[in-house]
């Protein structure tokens, strides 16, 4: 047996962005790997045939993070290309190119390209797509300009490239950087003509999007200067070319929107009792207003802290009129189902970290999950035992001695139970003294669990006791436990 090494994390691989084909035969997902020589990461799409259980890589461009199913056998994936004419003049403007891939044969071709940085795309119906893309209030899109207008804007950018004028709050975001005057804008694209057009006003920053044939539900923050914590809920109808406001933008922060028959479902944070990190209330919404179905006292996302996962996730899926979602409960994650008549019912889970999931029928579920002290893999669950479908990290920890976290729950001074964990040093000898490290998670609204955590395992392998807990302010025990308002 051997000890965990610092650089072992360079071997870890992370599956995410799970998307089932419409017929449920195939699962497409992204796999992230470390590129040590390039000082970065590689992302490629993989396909799991759920009949044979075999998985194979289907892209090799090292920058493909999401598959969009067009039908049972074809996916779209995006690549980005810098405009060569502008690059030679010292400016970087990005085209988004979508390629169409037959997952059976591997045959692929360019489907279409868009002159902007696309952040998400959804197939509405044959030949029509809804997409979101970055737009800017303080400058036009160079790729849409020509002639004197284009030359004038190029000159202005070259003249002012040494500084930024910041006029909005917040100024920046973790993992994004400065995004002053930037908006996420909703568009319609018509493949037959190559035309696209904006569906939201200039100052709308679009958040959640849910698409069905001929209609789009979305939420957005309309703002200038200071971004609010509340957002509006809207429905755009293709036949009428009309946008209806379902919830005004000054009422709720919103965790999810989806279709519920002819109405809509909204998970809104009222923020009356516990502020901006309050757990959501279920609302059924139509143009007449909202029906309050009660607050759910857990987070409707999986918020387990780990340093061994990266990628996009989907925490909610609607099948018919049942909403399936991942929550954070205790020190782990649960798959839950919500129906209007019965409310929330837990289906599967416990102390493991359920990261991402998809389902087409509400009977078979595909997960990216970290089970026990394993690294993330893809699993299938149909009501019985969890079935592991991939072994991307099977050899990485083979022969490595790990420290199993021991759960210790104690009661604090005002009678509230606090969940904690202790990891003994690898090779621990009773009676011998060891140094210790107390690890405190950030947040707010996060939670430590008993799963694999590279940094803490490395400390244990280096001869330290490691102890950590989920104090007040953590997720998994309801609003009152998580409340940090002074």
Where are these regions (language model features)?
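A short beta-strand motif characteristic of beta-propeller blades
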Residues: 4-10, 54-58, 107-112, 195-200, ...
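Conserved beta-propeller blade repeats
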Residues: 12-27, 61-78, 84, 115-135, ...
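Predominantly five- to eight-bladed beta-propeller fold
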Residues: 43, 85-95, 135-187, 279-282, ...
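Serine-hydrolase catalytic core recognition
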Residues: 356-363, 368-486
